[in-house]
């Protein structure tokens, strides 16, 4: 194991995203714990998404809230063959990604790729919002999202 001094970082967790089969039931459960999801929005195929080099639909419902300083995002796929639909079918749901904020996206992609991460998906919502997803072989099952803009 390599022993290195921790470097100062400007990275912060923006949110942790969960793919769920029933967003309404999940919101109801979280509400019973005092966790309020304040924004729910439907997305449709008009969003340009590249997933493993192929253009795919991004049909889903997303709800956002907070648990203290950490944002929570719930995602329910509503279309067949979307990245979230594939994840739900493979895993039954669960943590999909950790979103990092406060970054220069291009610089962060270069830094993460230099460290072994691989971009596997990009989504654009208009001109102002871009989400880039990266996998890291040394942390199987963990996906990082770099998000530019907010919806």
Predicted features, each with a name:
Residues 1-7, 13-21, 63-76, 87-104, ...:
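Vicinal oxygen chelate
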Residues 41-57, 80-85, 95, 125-131:
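A cross-kingdom feature marking solvent-exposed beta-strand/loop segments within repeated
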Residues 37-40, 48, 54-73:
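Short, well-structured hydrophobic secondary-structure segments
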Residues 38, 82-83, 139-144:
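Short loop/beta submotifs within extracellular cysteine-rich repeat domains
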Residues 24-44, 88-93, 103-126:
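Extended intrinsically disordered, low-complexity coil regions enriched in Ser, Thr, Gly, Ala
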């Amino acid at each position: 194991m390599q022993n290195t001094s921790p470097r100062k970082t400007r990275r912060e967790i923006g949110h942790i995203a969960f793919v769920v089969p029933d967003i309404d039931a999940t919101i109801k459960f979280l509400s019973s714990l005092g966790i309020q999801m304040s924004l729910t929005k439907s997305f449709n195929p008009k969003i340009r998404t590249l997933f493993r080099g192929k253009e795919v639909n991004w049909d889903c419902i997303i709800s956002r809230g907070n648990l203290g300083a950490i944002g929570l995002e719930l995602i329910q796929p509503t279309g067949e063959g979307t990245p979230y639909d594939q994840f739900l079918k493979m895993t039954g749901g669960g943590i999909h990604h950790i979103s990092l904020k406060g970054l220069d996206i291009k610089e962060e992609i270069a830094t993460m790729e230099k460290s072994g991460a691989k971009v596997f998906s990009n989504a654009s919502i208009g001109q102002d919002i871009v989400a880039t997803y990266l996998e890291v072989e040394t942390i199987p099952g963990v996906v990082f999202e770099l998000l530019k803009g907010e919806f």
